[in-house]
From Swiss-Prot:
The lineage of its organism: Bacteria, Pseudomonadati, Pseudomonadota, Gammaproteobacteria, Enterobacterales. The keyword Transferase does not apply. The gene is grpE. Belongs to the GrpE family. One of its GO terms (molecular function) is adenyl-nucleotide exchange factor activity. It is found in: Cytoplasm. It comes from Serratia proteamaculans (strain 568). It comes from the Bacteria. GO terms for biological process: protein folding. This is Protein GrpE. Residues 1-30 are annotated as: Disordered. InterPro entries: GrpE, GrpE_coiled_coil, GrpE_head.
Length: 190
C-alpha cells in the first residue's frame, strides 16, 4: 500500500464504527421484514383456514340439500297414492257391507256373493301391494294413533282399554294413517 492509501488509526476506527452502526440499522430492517413476513404468513394461514371452513360448510350444505331432496322424492313416491287411496276406502267398505247384508241362505245369490267376495279379496290384495294396511283387529290395546273410540263398554270378557268391536276399519299407507278405525273400547266392570 502506498502512503496515500494508508489510513490513519482514527480513520480506521471511525470507518469501523460506521460499519457497526449500519449493521444494527440493517439488522433492525431485517427484523421488521421478518416480523412483517411472519404477520403476513399468519394472515395467509388464517385466510386459508377460513376458506377451507367455508368450503367444508358449503359441501356439508350441499350434502344436506341432496339428502333432503332424496327424502322428499322418496316420500312423494311413497305417498303419491294417498288421495287416491282415501277415495278407494269407501269402495272397500261398501263391498264388505254388501257381504255382511247378503242373504247367504238364498241359493240364487250364491254366485253373486262369491263374485263380491272375489272382488273384495282382489281389491284388498291390490291395496296391500301398494302399501295400504288394514287396521281392524279386535282384542288389541286401544291405540289413539290408529283408533277412534266411538263408545266405551263394560266387559268381563275383554281386558280394560282394549278394542272390543270394530265399527269401521281403518287404513294406513306406508305407516301413515289414512283413516282411523272406529272402535268400541272395553272398560272394567264397575
Amino acid at each position: 500500500m502506498s502512503s496515500k492509501e494508508q489510513k490513519t488509526p482514527n480513520e480506521q476506527v471511525s470507518e469501523e464504527m460506521e460499519q457497526q452502526e449500519v449493521l444494527p440499522e440493517a439488522a433492525e430492517g431485517v427484523d421488521l421484514r421478518d416480523e412483517r413476513i411472519a404477520e403476513l404468513e399468519a394472515q395467509l394461514a388464517e385466510a386459508q383456514q377460513h376458506e377451507r371452513d367455508s368450503l367444508l360448510r358449503a359441501k356439508a350444505e350441499m350434502e344436506n340439500v341432496r339428502r333432503r331432496t332424496e327424502l322428499d322424492i322418496e316420500k312423494a313416491h311413497k305417498f303419491a297414492l294417498e288421495k287416491f287411496s282415501g277415495d278407494l276406502l269407501p269402495v272397500l267398505d261398501n263391498l264388505e257391507r254388501a257381504l255382511e247384508l247378503a242373504d247367504k241362505n238364498n241359493p240364487e245369490l250364491t254366485a253373486m256373493i262369491e263374485g263380491i267376495e272375489l272382488t273384495l279379496k282382489s281389491l284388498q290384495d291390490v291395496v296391500r301391494k301398494y302399501g295400504i294396511e288394514i287396521v281392524g283387529d279386535t282384542n288389541v290395546p286401544f291405540n289413539p294413533e290408529v283408533h277412534q273410540a266411538m263408545s266405551l263398554m263394560e266387559s268381563a270378557d275383554h281386558q280394560p282399554n282394549h278394542v272390543m268391536m270394530v265399527m269401521q276399519k281403518g287404513y294406513t299407507l306406508n305407516g301413515r294413517l289414512l283413516r282411523p278405525a272406529m272402535v268400541a273400547v272395553s272398560k272394567a266392570k264397575a
